[in-house]
Amino acid sequence: MTPPIKKNNTGLDLKQLFIGSEGILGIITAATIRIFDKPQERIVLWVGIRSFKETLKLYERITAMFQDQITSFELMNKKSISIIKQNEFNFKIANNKIFCLIEISNFQKIDDFGDFVINKLSVLDTEKMEIIVSKSEYENQVIWNLRESIPVEERKIGSIIKHDVSIPL
């Protein structure tokens, strides 16, 4: 039995090259998968920020506050967001250069999870950012649809920028 290996997105190593070779360099004979329970509830945040430096501060604060409850932290630039035609939330694109989609999941069965998240967010310096907090599963999906519509809209205008990367922060 092989010991479990945790996924690590902090850089390329020989093991990753071997795994990504699709069988050319070798065959995987065993795998260990860590499975989590489905979250009881999730809240999606849409955050507009004026600078990358402020985004790093937000990331540090959010990870300190929510730790393992963060199931997604996605970063998008102003140009990508400006091509989205429909926007139910009417967020301000002009004031912000960077947008983050942050998903926080309730794995611990916390009662009133929405209030829990909002109370924790109240310590953030919201003067430099615009935050939209989802209030329902429908709004969660609307925010995710904004993110997922970017590649579709890029294909329509003919310029596609692919930059789905993981970096250590």
Feature annotation, model-predicted:
Residues 37, 46-169:
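C-terminal substrate-recognition/cap domain of FAD-linked oxidoreductases
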Residues 1-74:
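FAD-binding subdomain of flavoenzyme oxidoreductases
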